[in-house]
């Protein structure tokens, strides 16, 4: 490959110091083409610009490279077929559909049918994609981010979208407790307050952060699944009756615990949908969804786990879209309650788990082992030199004895009924028993499990709790919400000023190499402390019949049907 230095010099003109730094890192080989796309788009370099720079460096632009491996794909050859209804199986939402409070897969699948974000984090693309924001850029230290908005956008109720709507939306999402109740506080806590959101002009919004943050665009993207833009003054408690948003579809009907229908939004700013309508049917668990696909009662399963899905995973009758993902499970241990006040006990639990065995048995290989910290293969900043923790029963027993538990102990783990999690709970119980740890299981449905806050919550207050975490394009939420002293989801009650300081340093870093250095420190620190066990990373899976084309899922359970269609 030959580098075109003249073209590269031309493309450098007018670029910021940070943008030129990333170009330097690419040219020197310190930054891979894949990581250049991800980090370049994060700081606001457009997809066409990134592609042109890659082309000038030699080879293809790579700007459309998929971040997934797919058996079956989201696209197909031939002209799209217009018309018809696409039938989708989805997990039942655990509560009323409310973007301000949503925290479950079924709810967020519903929200993105009519709602849109400033930025789209597509698992099928490496670079962040403009949605309601056309462009974004940071100041020199990443403490202020400026977003240029798409103009001519109309909500599906006929009302124009303005900068005032964007400002109001993020002020609601970032309102701190106790007045604020947004689930987005897991993202915005310590990062953004309502006072930091400002309208600059009719098409520009500025975010002044509480501290510099190099990954902030992910915080206002589809990763922050409740952050759809709504009209100023929206009553979120009544959103389920309108599904007001700027997306390609608008609400046809919604029946709690049964399903929903959507029809094209005639005022949509983008390409119009091919479908006449979409129909979602809700299911309380995965087995009936698989049976519905096999019985031709639905065309698509929005998201599923590989456990118990061999009949569709191994059949040529179905298309399977497989996405690289940071979906994972977290086993929190209360660091303020005996015996988990001693990090040796927490480490002992971690050493009992057979991670490769769990990936093989529960994920059918559609995932990878994790290492007891929230940095995984999806993230460019992960320090891959840190050794992988493996099952070592002898080591676990040694740690327990040193901590004063030579005969083990008995405790209770709370968990939820969702995908493979009940089976994972059984695996953890069986593995821990090999070291003398007796774990009693308390497994409930998601409505009960997530229905309360600190003080009366099965997942936030249990001595041990096993919980699902959806995909994020950057690890910041995983680093802060469940682990920092003021984290909104700190079920482990992990309060450590050294860790809090490291997370602040990581968040503030704009440079990828600096992020990697700090990530390595965090990884090693968490391996020593082990407030949370991370068994594995899970690939995102969506299934459809062979007649379905144009699906655009994310591994956080969103399903975009803007360009979906059914071939004859």
Model-derived features with residue positions:
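N-terminal secretory signal peptides
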Residues: 1-35, 47-55
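Long beta-strand-rich cores associated with HINT superfamily self-processing modules
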Residues: 70, 542-568
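N-terminal lobe/hinge region of extracytoplasmic solute-binding protein
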Residues: 89-140, 171, 242-246
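Gly/Pro-rich hinge or "lid" segments in bacterial periplasmic/extracellular proteins
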Residues: 122-124, 213, 220-273, 277, ...
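Surface-exposed binding/hinge segments that line
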Residues: 148, 183-230, 253
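Ligand-site clamp/hinge motif
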Residues: 150, 237, 266-311, 417, ...
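Structural transition elements
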Residues: 249, 368-402, 420-423
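Extracytoplasmic/peripheral linker and loop segments enriched in polar/acidic and small residues
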Residues: 439-450, 477-546, 568
């Amino acid at each position: 490959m030959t580098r075109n230095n003249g073209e590269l010099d031309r493309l450098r003109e007018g670029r910021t110091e940070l943008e030129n730094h990333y170009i330097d890192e690419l040219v020197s080989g310190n930054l891979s083409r894949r990581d250049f796309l991800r980090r370049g788009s994060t700081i606001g370099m457009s997809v066409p610009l990134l592609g042109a720079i890659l082309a000038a460096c030699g080879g293809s632009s790579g700007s459309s490279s998929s971040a997934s491996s797919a058996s079956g794909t989201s696209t197909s050859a031939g002209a799209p077929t217009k018309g018809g209804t696409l039938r989708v199986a989805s997990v039942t939402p655990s509560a009323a559909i409310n973007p301000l409070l949503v925290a479950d897969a079924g709810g967020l699948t519903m929200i993105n049918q009519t709602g849109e974000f400033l930025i789209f984090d597509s698992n099928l693309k490496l670079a962040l994609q403009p949605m309601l924001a056309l462009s974004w850029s940071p100041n020199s230290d990443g403490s202020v981010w400026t977003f240029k908005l798409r103009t001519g956008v109309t909500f599906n109720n006929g009302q124009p979208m303005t900068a005032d709507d964007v400002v109001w939306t993020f002020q609601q999402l970032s309102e701190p407790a106790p007045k604020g109740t947004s689930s987005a506080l897991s993202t915005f806590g310590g990062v953004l307050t309502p006072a930091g959101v400002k309208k600059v002009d009719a098409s520009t919004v500025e975010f002044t952060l509480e501290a510099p943050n190099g990954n902030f665009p992910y915080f206002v993207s589809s990763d922050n699944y409740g952050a759809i833009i709504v009209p100023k003054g929206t009553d979120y408690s009544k959103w389920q009756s309108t599904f007001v948003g700027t997306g390609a579809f608008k609400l046809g009907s919604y029946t709690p615990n049964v399903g929903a229908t959507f029809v094209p939004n005639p005022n949509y700013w983008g390409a119009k949908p091919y479908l006449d309508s979409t129909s979602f049917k809700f299911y309380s668990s995965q087995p009936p969804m698989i049976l519905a696909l096999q019985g031709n009662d639905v065309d698509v399963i929005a998201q599923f786990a590989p456990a118990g899905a061999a009949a569709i995973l191994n059949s040529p009758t179905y298309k399977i879209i497989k996405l690289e993902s940071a979906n994972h499970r977290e086993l929190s241990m209360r660091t303020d309650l005996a015996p988990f006040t001693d990090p040796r006990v927490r480490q002992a639990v971690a050493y009992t788990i057979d991670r490769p065995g769990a990936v093989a048995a529960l994920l059918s290989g559609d995932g990878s082992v994790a290492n007891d910290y929230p940095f995984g293969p999806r993230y460019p900043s992960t320090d891959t030199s840190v050794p992988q923790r493996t099952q070592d029963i002898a080591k676990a027993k040694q740690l327990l004895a040193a901590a004063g538990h030579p005969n083990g102990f008995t405790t209770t783990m709370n968990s939820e009924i969702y995908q493979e999690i009940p089976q994972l709970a059984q695996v953890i119980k069986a593995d821990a028993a090999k070291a003398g740890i007796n774990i009693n299981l308390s497994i409930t449905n998601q409505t009960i499990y997530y229905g309360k806050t600190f003080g009366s919550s099965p997942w936030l207050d249990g001595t041990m709790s096993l919980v699902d975490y959806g995909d994020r394009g950057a690890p910041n939420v995983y680093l802060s919400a469940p682990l920092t002293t003021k984290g909104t989801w700190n079920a482990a009650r992990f309060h450590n000023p050294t860790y809090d300081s490291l997370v602040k340093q990581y968040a503030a870093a704009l440079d990828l190499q600096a992020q990697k250095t700090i990530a390595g420190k965090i990884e090693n620190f968490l391996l020593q402390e082990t407030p949370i066990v991370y068994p594995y990373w899970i690939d995102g899976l969506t299934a459809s019949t062979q007649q379905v084309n144009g699906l655009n899922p994310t591994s956080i359970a969103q399903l975009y049907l803007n360009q979906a269609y059914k071939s004859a």
